[in-house]
A protein has these predicted regions:
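Charge-rich amphipathic alpha-helical interaction elements
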Residues: 1-147
Length: 147
């Protein structure tokens, strides 16, 4: 029984470590999502709050149009990256939830096994105590008969 508990404890440590690793990965992924959101916001501000439209100069208008188009491509790319990062974060969240459940169920099994071991030990100790008490009682009975 003790070997089983030791094995369960080792498995519990592994599951606990897996939960911590997944928590760390999820936190990193959420930071990435936030960083991408800030990038998108900052790039959108560049497009929306750039210099006012220049009138008359075709080259300047062309440059400004090219600039806004490139910024918009970067925004679109960042949105795609954000969507992928969000999907990955959701996947990690699901994995973390599943791993947490496995870790918790193993913890409950381990607690039950420990309790069973304690109860078995207490029963053995009680049997020894009962045996010693019975011997004392028998000796007292024999001593009283001999008197």
């Amino acid at each position: 029984m003790s070997k089983l508990i030791h094995t369960l404890e080792q498995l519990h440590l592994l599951r606990n470590r897996a939960v911590k690793d997944l928590s760390s990965k999820l936190a990193t992924q959420q930071q990435l999502c936030q960083r991408l959101e800030k990038n998108i916001h900052a790039l959108s501000n560049l497009v929306n709050h750039s210099a006012p439209e220049i009138q008359g100069n075709a080259t300047m208008l062309n440059n400004q149009s090219f600039y806004k188009r490139n910024i918009q491509r970067v925004i679109d790319w960042q949105r795609q990256e954000q969507a992928l990062a969000t999907v990955e974060a959701q996947k990690l969240q699901g994995n973390l939830l599943a791993e947490s459940r496995r870790e918790k169920s193993l913890e409950l099994v381990l607690d039950v096994r420990r309790q069973d071991l304690r109860q078995a030990q207490e029963r053995r100790e009680q049997k020894v105590t009962d045996a010693v008490s019975a011997q004392c009682w028998l000796r007292q009975q024999q001593a009283q008969r001999q008197r």
